Regions:
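A glycine-rich, hydrophobic loop/mini-helix early in the fold
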Residues: 24-55
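Unchanged
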Residues: 14, 23-26, 31, 59-149
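Residue-level structural signal for beta-strand termini and adjacent loop
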Residues: 18-19, 45, 95
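Acidic, metal-coordinating catalytic segment for phosphate/diphosphate chemistry
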Residues: 1-28, 34
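Short hydrophobic/aromatic patches on beta-strands that form ligand-binding or substrate-lining surfaces
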Residues: 49, 107, 154
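Short, amphipathic C-terminal "tail helix"
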Residues: 151-167
Length: 167
């Protein structure tokens, strides 16, 4: 966290608080079955807001030279125990550029296989949930999922999927 002395467009000087964060990733783990598509979500306690929330698997590593796909595969395995046959980078977003300079890579994970998770100490209470697409969308609309990154990633995925279907 830093405070920069800035000069605004009108010439006034001021202080601007900035949170410096390493890149992160968010993963849409989609399990396509004859019964439909399902997503894997994680539920965990978020200290900053003092409550448990459901969201897509996401996070970052404090390693300078990590490839985004490697980070996404690692976060998926760490939090859910899932591995993906295919990872597709859908886009890169800025999470909250009003106060933070962190970028987030949005990945689609397909061809999922189950394995053992490898959670960090702060993730020991994390729970994994498999939900249908209809349930996930209902959760976004009724406020059970309030994570802006999960909502944005889903919107990006829907646009990507529609454009691929229109080929």
């Amino acid at each position: 966290v830093r405070e920069d002395v800035i000069e605004r467009a009108n010439g006034e000087r001021g202080i601007y608080g900035v949170v410096d964060k390493d890149p992160a990733c968010i993963v849409l783990p989609i399990d396509s079955t004859p019964d439909g598509d399902f997503l894997y979500l994680v539920e965990q306690f978020r200290y900053t807001v003092g409550a448990r929330f459901m969201e897509l698997p996401q996070g970052g590593w404090e390693i300078a030279d990590v490839y985004p796909e490697e980070m996404a595969r690692g976060e998926l395995r760490e939090e859910t125990g899932l591995s993906a046959e295919r990872m597709t980078l859908l886009t890169t977003l800025q999470i909250g550029y009003g106060v933070m300079n962190q970028k987030q890579y949005v990945f689609l994970a397909e061809g999922l296989t189950h394995g053992e998770h490898d959670r960090d100490a702060e993730e020991t209470d994390l729970e994994v949930h498999r939900v249908s697409v209809a349930e996930f969308e209902a959760m976004l609309l009724d406020g059970r999922i309030v994570d802006n990154c999960s909502a944005a990633a889903w919107g990006i995925y829907r646009l990507w999927r529609e454009r691929r279907a229109g080929r």
